[in-house]
Amino acid sequence: MRLVDAHCHLEVKDFADAAPVLERARAAGLIHAIIVGQFHGPGDWGNALELAAAHPEFLSPTLGIHPHEAARATEDDLATLERTCARPEVRAVGEAGLDYYYDHSPREAQARIFRLQCELAVKLGKPLVVHVRDAHEDCDAILGEVGVSKGVIHCFTGHTDAARRYLDRGFYLSLSGVITYKKTEALQDAVRFAPLDRLMVETDSPYLAPVPHRGRKNEPSHVVETARKLAELKGVTLETVTEVTTANAAALFNLNLR
């Protein structure tokens, strides 16, 4: 098995010692993971960069300003983000987007910071990693206005109509452990609708552990359960899901996988 975890947060304090986590990931069949550096204050992106630099054969970083933190981001933060995302080892901009479920930042601030990161991704020619919750129409509108056509909707939990919109823009959909949960029929219908060659699998570690690990801290090794559920929903083998989703991640993030 050669899986890629397309979105994890190994830089957070929940993973004070990443070494055993990475060992378990390799033992489970993972060959790479995308570590998503989030912004909570000055210096936060450094954690993801340092961890990825220590394990370049297994981890690749992306950097962004999460919508929860949009109101806190300063012009200096945005300048730092642009300068750092221009580095070749940074594979994408984000996660960036809109979150109307929690609304931790005013929606106007979320939209402004999201738009700026969309523009940055286009300027740098890098993919955009999108976080969107209860805001699909506004998110799709901004993507269209800026002209972003290369990216991934991380932890996609929308309905078929939302999936169709993003797929029509050329985006990938990344699926988390949520697809293994009960009462997610609408999401599962969207997964059945989406072509396998536009899908990825992720953990969003340490959050959203899939069944049978739900309720515990998530980690990259658990992405196997999400891949297994995806195979069930698509009516294909786990090997097929592994091959295709890994190829998708490699294509979007420009990964040289061995």
Which residues make up each language-model segment?
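Mid-domain alpha/beta scaffold segments of enzyme catalytic cores
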Residues: 1-258
